């Protein structure tokens, strides 16, 4: 579960290393974001020469959460860290590579480019 002020790792090669969630998109009273949900975030740490800089406000999609999520078949999925992928124009990722596994929920929410770039879909 991701909410305001949550810090997330960045799972792509845009140059950002850490994000701070500012807002969960999808309704004025929406408090939590899970895998496949879009958030507005600020870049808190970035490497020099990256496509995003520290302080940039970006949209990102959550790809991994520490909080377990129950699936329709009764199984649960959880990861070791909270991570997100920065989005560019539309729902396409800004980076060209994705690091680490991503949740299968991204396919259901039509983030096909992220699913195809990811090394593993769990």
Swiss-Prot record:
GO cellular component: cytosolic large ribosomal subunit
Entry keyword annotation includes Ribosomal protein: yes
Keywords: Ribonucleoprotein, Ribosomal protein, RNA-binding, rRNA-binding
Example GO molecular function: structural constituent of ribosome
Short name of any one Pfam family annotated for the protein: Ribosomal_L14
Keyword RNA-binding recorded: yes
InterPro entries, A to Z: Ribosomal_uL14, Ribosomal_uL14_bac-type, Ribosomal_uL14_CS, Ribosomal_uL14_sf
Gene Ontology biological process terms from the UniProt entry: translation
Record Gene3D superfamilies: Ribosomal protein L14
Assembly and oligomerization: Part of the 50S ribosomal subunit. Forms a cluster with proteins L3 and L19. In the 70S ribosome, L14 and L19 interact and together make contacts with the 16S rRNA in bridges B5 and B8.
UniProt record similarity statement: Belongs to the universal ribosomal protein uL14 family.
NCBIfam families linked to this entry: rplN_bact
Described purpose of this protein according to its UniProt entry: Binds to 23S rRNA. Forms part of two intersubunit bridges in the 70S ribosome.
Protein name: Large ribosomal subunit protein uL14
Gene source species: Bifidobacterium animalis subsp. lactis (strain AD011)
Gene behind the chain: rplN
